[in-house]
Regions:
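Substrate-binding pocket helix/loop in short-chain dehydrogenase/reductase
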Residues: 88-101, 199-200
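Residue(s) in the substrate-gating loop at a strand-loop-helix junction
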Residues: 131
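Active-site loop immediately N-terminal to the catalytic Tyr-X3-Lys motif
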Residues: 90, 136-142, 164, 207, ...
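Short C-terminal tail/terminal secondary-structure segment
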Residues: 1, 136, 220, 231-248
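Active-site helix of classical SDR
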Residues: 112, 147, 155
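C-terminal helical subdomain
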Residues: 171, 179, 193-226, 230, ...
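Alpha-helical segment proximal to the catalytic Tyr-Lys
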Residues: 117, 160-164, 228
Length: 248
């Protein structure tokens, strides 16, 4: 694709591995300048990483400030960092629920809040990565599901609030995307290979997992002017997992 993203400075939270790394790779292929905010350092040569604990509000502010100082502009923000941490209704508690919201939702707001002055100047775009758990439920993950519901709601709210500045806001909703974190979860199952096969069998298109790069390609499109009249959308990149008949 030629999405005219060359030299555009795009922040990717949680960009050091998994879906975030897939997004970074596709942005690099488009000659953009992805900047990762993560506790880990990106293993991709030449990619700038700002190491930060995104559950710390001041760290969010400082990360944006440092990126703006170093690069001079911010052309896009991809809110991606988070973890399905299994805080459920039966065994969770107040603190674990609140902590999960900080890991999965609050920094979406804070990064966008601090990046907003720069995005107004560049008329940039925001893409929020979300999860099917907000729509389908999963069981055993109340806080993560709530956080993703919040991500979807913020996408629509920001799309309205930022219309006046020409800033577009969309979400990419992920279902079954095979990443290192997903592999770690599979290994906790009683029969990992059997569980993996059963999940794949329920993905309508191709009976396979979505790849991080496929998520990245849609994200790159939404960041680009090729999607200049698209805002407030929750776009499912999931092989039909959420909306198509599982009997297919």
């Amino acid at each position: 694709m030629n999405l005219s993203l060359e030299n555009k400075v795009i922040i990717v939270s949680g960009g050091a591995r998994g879906i975030g790394e897939g997004i970074v790779k596709t942005l690099l292929a488009e000659k953009a300048i992805p900047v990762v905010i993560d506790q880990r350092v990106s293993s991709i040569e030449g990619v700038k990483t700002i190491q930060a604990d995104l559950t710390n509000p001041q760290a969010c502010a400082t990360a944006i400030e440092n990126i703006a100082k170093e690069f001079g502009s911010i052309d896009g923000l991809v809110n991606n960092a988070g973890v399905n941490d299994g805080v459920n209704l039966a065994n969770g508690n107040y603190q674990s629920f609140i902590d999960s919201l900080h890991k999965n939702l609050v920094h979406y707001y804070l990064l966008a809040h601090h990046a907003l002055p720069y995005l107004k100047t560049s008329k940039g775009a925001i893409v929020n990565i979300s999860s099917k758990t907000a729509e389908t439920g999963q069981g055993g993950t109340s806080a993560y599901a709530a956080a993703n519901g919040g991500r979807n709601a913020l996408t629509r709210e920001w799309a309205v609030e930022l219309l006046q500045f020409g800033i577009r806001v969309n979400a990419v909703v992920v279902a079954e995307c095979y990443t290192p974190m997903y592999q770690e979860w599979i290994q906790t199952q009683e029969n990992p290979e059997e569980k993996l096969q059963s999940i794949q069998a329920n993905i309508p298109l191709g009976k396979r997992f979505t790849t991080p790069e496929e998520i990245g390609q849609t994200v790159s499109f939404l960041l680009s002017e090729k999607s200049s009249h698209t805002t407030g959308q929750l776009i499912h990149v999931d092989g039909g997992y959420v909306h198509l008949d599982r009997a297919l």
